[in-house]
């Protein structure tokens, strides 16, 4: 629930798509008579709803998914994974929904240690939601940009080809490093663009499980 979820240029923000996917997964769990819970995080765990069964519990989760607003702007996936590991003692199926942009300066994921511990206890899958337009910068001249999480801002000359290429290379590197990490720990992952049919992405994820 960090501020980066608000980004969106294709008619729907990442927040909208994340909320819809979370709701679909919750409905599916209730239909299968499974318990369902939710953990909301930014750079800290914002709210934890313990797993339960029942329609009223489902509606409570859906309401929180739609209405919840974080108290801070950052992202710390490690915090969420550590909390999950400690809060749920029995093995469970868990879905991590995020843009997965939580990296070191070299682009490597910051959450490897927490992931390694979590997957030893739980069946974890990753659903990455992204906006394709976020991964490239159009040539539109001098632009003032602001990081939605850190609050830092700067003027950027988007006509600089080297800068645009470096930006795209950075995103590509982040994606490759995260994919290697998930393969290393046998974590199923699907990437869903905000302008794609997320149902197809979810079907692909479940077919591969």
What are these regions (language model features)?
Residues 1-52, 93, 97-98, 105, ...:
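An amphipathic, basic-hydrophobic helix/alpha-beta surface used to engage anionic
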Residues 5, 65-69, 186-189:
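Short amphipathic alpha-helical interaction patches enriched in hydrophobic/aromatic residues
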Residues 20, 24, 75-82, 176, ...:
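Short, contiguous clusters of charged residues that form electrostatic/catalytic patches at enzyme active sites
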Residues 21, 57, 61, 80, ...:
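Internal, well-ordered alpha-helical segments in soluble enzyme and binding-protein domains
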Residues 48-64, 180, 185, 207-208:
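Short, electropositive alpha-helical surface patch
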Residues 57-92, 104-106, 131-132:
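Von Willebrand factor
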Residues 83-90, 104-209:
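Von Willebrand factor type A / integrin I
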